[in-house]
Design a protein with these regions (language model features):
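Non-catalytic helical/linker scaffolds that mediate oligomerization, partner binding
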Residues: 1-475
Length: 475
């Protein structure tokens, strides 16, 4: 039986990944999901990249997943004169309306409600927190006066963060709506929503998806605002997955607080049995260098040991010099640590009697039985993918092999920890079905003759209902 990694790798598309050969090599080295960053995406380019991925994935029979990452509300200043340096105590005016070239006294702000939303005493962060300002006054129309707290070089088009301010800007912008509609037409597998603040943001995107397709496209909430941390329980109840977006999160809150927040978010995601992705600056030195720093190796390893479903690469693969090598390195780190006994696995069984209580309980006990008898695989039949999420969350030692006649979820499930999905549509009888899927597991190299498997099915099998049966088989 070959050893396969269970923690998934998400790689961001870009100029460095435009070649079908590079895409093929990346998949073979361990990429499970390709991310489209709509902050830097031309629709015709994206369409071509998706076409390449699907063609390569089909040839490799890899079920590679596609994640559309919406930009969200990006606040920026306008162009400024060259060579401006600000010192602590300097005063500066932020102004919206007609665009202009800024100087050391006044800069353009692209957010029209900036002066209405901010209040005196709140902080304005510029250029990933390199410059910090405190709001002195606002006319509530177009002008905000601020004082420099932390100075530095003032550069054009830099991003703005408002950690203390409740923005009236929706999480789903006009650009996001256009990009989301395009992504839906492309049949992407997941959509990530940036700068989520509350559950209403998730519902807005859900409603948009429902208006344009009858198929479920799961939503990942990107956690990068203090408001999201405050509302995390409600957000989790509405979304289908989390992304710990440490870049903006580490600007909006003190960076020293991010590690514990990351661990807490992973823990909450596992409790809700939804996937969680750790993102941003994981192996950033490999954009230009063939080797990762020791700190980066530790970061990836610790994210895996925290229990992340996936670890994500951004610039490393989109614009980096070594998109294939960085996947090799990340896969190597995952293989080295993901079977460590130091990793803690959630143990508390489901106790809320919902409609799916029986299925949840069977999935929980299937994992414990599989670990107990040292089964090499848990094989489950599913039409919605629900049992895959449930089994994965309990982190079994065995492979999780999912068999489905629903082609839509084959690629969606490629994001989920430990899951490998196969198309299967022959539902004659329970005995025949179990025999056939066990043979597929053996033929694909996941089990050998004499190995034990745990089979999860719904009886009667032709109804494709909720899982209600657990069975231990010998290959």
């Amino acid at each position: 039986m070959s050893e396969r990694k269970k923690t998934k790798i998400v790689a961001t598309l870009g100029p460095s990944t435009d070649s079908p050969l590079i895409i093929k090599k990346m998949i073979l080295e361990g990429v499970d999901v390709f991310r489209i960053n709509f902050s830097h995406a031309d629709h015709s380019e994206v369409e071509n990249r998706i076409k390449i991925i699907r063609e390569v994935s089909e040839k490799l029979q890899s079920n590679t997943s596609i994640l559309a990452d919406l930009q969200g509300p990006k606040l920026r200043i306008g162009k400024v004169e060259d060579g401006i340096s600000l010192e602590p105590g300097d005063l500066i005016t932020f102004q919206n309306g007609e665009t202009f070239i800024g100087d050391r006294q006044k800069v353009y702000m692209n957010y029209k409600n900036f002066s209405k939303d901010v209040k005196p005493g709140e902080r304005v962060l510029l250029d990933d927190g390199k410059l910090i300002f405190e709001v002195i006054s606002t006319d509530k129309k177009s002008i905000v006066e601020a004082k420099v707290i932390q100075g530095g070089s003032l550069k054009s088009k830099k991003g703005v963060n408002l950690p203390n301010t409740k923005l009236s800007l929706p999480a789903l912008t006009e650009k996001d709506v256009i990009d989301a509609e395009f992504a839906i037409k492309q049949n992407v597998d997941w959509v990530a929503l940036s700068f989520v603040r509350n559950s209403n943001d998730i519902m807005d995107l859900k409603n948009l998806i429902d208006q344009h397709t009858v198929h479920k496209i799961p939503i990942i909430a990107k956690i990068e605002k203090p408001e999201a941390i405050e509302n995390i329980d409600k957000i989790i109840s509405y979304c289908d997955g989390l992304m710990v977006a440490r870049g903006d999160l580490g600007v909006e809150i003190p960076p020293a607080e991010v590690p514990l927040i990351q661990k807490e978010l992973v823990k909450l995601a596992k409790k809700a049995r939804i996937p969680v992705i750790i993102a941003t600056q994981m192996m950033e030195s490999m954009i230009d260098c063939l080797t990762a720093s020791r700190a980066e190796v530790n970061d990836v390893a610790n994210s895996v040991m925290d229990g992340a479903d996936a670890v994500m690469l951004s610039g490393e693969t989109s614009v980096g010099k070594y998109p294939v090598e960085v996947i090799q390195t990340m896969s190597s780190i995952i293989h080295s640590v993901e079977h460590s006994e130091l990793i803690t696995v959630p143990q508390k069984p489901p106790n809320i009697r919902t409609v799916r209580f029986v299925t949840k309980s069977i999935c929980y006990h299937a994992v414990h039985i599989a670990n107990d008898v040292q089964a090499k695989a848990i094989c489950t039949l599913t039409n919605s993918g629900y049992t895959a999420f449930q089994v994965s969350a309990w982190r079994p030692n065995s492979h999780i092999l999912v068999f489905t006649s629903n082609k839509r979820i084959l690629t969606q499930l490629n994001l989920i920890w430990g899951v490998k999905a196969f198309f299967y549509d022959s539902f004659e009888s329970t005995d025949k079905t179990v025999e056939q899927i066990n043979k597929i597991a053996k033929d694909k190299g996941y089990v050998d003759k004499g190995d034990l498997l745990v089979n999860l099915t719904a009886m009667p099998i032709i109804d494709k209902g909720m899982v209600n049966t657990l069975r231990v088989s010998i290959v």
